């Protein structure tokens, strides 16, 4: 069988197109004895170390689909809630409905710069550290002024913490 790969296509600041291709990985879960309720479904607790984070997930065997948010999957039921141990990321199902239409995910065919995960995270880190500098650095003839709610020029927003989902 061929090796399965996951391709992430991303666009930073509506201008920098990134492509990160990696081998597919699955979390190795430990199912615990605790139970809770999410959206009125009886859920069981599971934990794992995955992509540099410790995850806690609540899944329901009432919906026997081994899927969940982001790349969290592989449990004997749908993951309805998941969060990392540092509180940086949290996913909670807000509702479910039956879809009767098919909506394909379309690729626009535009060129994306290929890179590994480390380089991908570096681009995002640069953007979060100085969003305006990231944009104007890519377009030398563009200047940008950030204004407050009263129309007064303010300092460029900087130092937004960047905590990548995958480390």
Please tell me what each predicted stretch does.
Residues 1-167:
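Extended soluble regions of mature proteins
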């Amino acid at each position: 069988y061929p090796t399965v790969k996951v391709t992430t296509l991303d666009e930073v600041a509506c201008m920098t197109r990134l492509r990160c291709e990696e081998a597919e990985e699955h979390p190795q879960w430990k199912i615990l004895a605790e139970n809770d309720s999410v959206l009125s479904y009886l859920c069981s607790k599971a934990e794992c170390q995955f992509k540099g984070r410790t995850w806690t997930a609540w899944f329901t065997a009432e919906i026997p689909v081994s899927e969940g948010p982001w790349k969290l999957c592989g449990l004997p039921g749908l993951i309805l809630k998941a969060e990392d141990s540092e509180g940086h990321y949290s996913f909670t199902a807000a509702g479910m409905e039956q879809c009767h239409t098919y909506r394909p995910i379309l690729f626009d065919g535009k060129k994306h710069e290929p890179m590994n995960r480390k380089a991908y995270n570096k681009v995002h880190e640069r953007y979060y550290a100085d969003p305006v500098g990231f944009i104007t650095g890519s377009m030398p003839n563009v200047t940008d002024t950030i204004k407050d709610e009263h129309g007064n020029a303010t300092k460029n927003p900087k130092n937004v913490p960047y905590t990548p989902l995958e480390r």
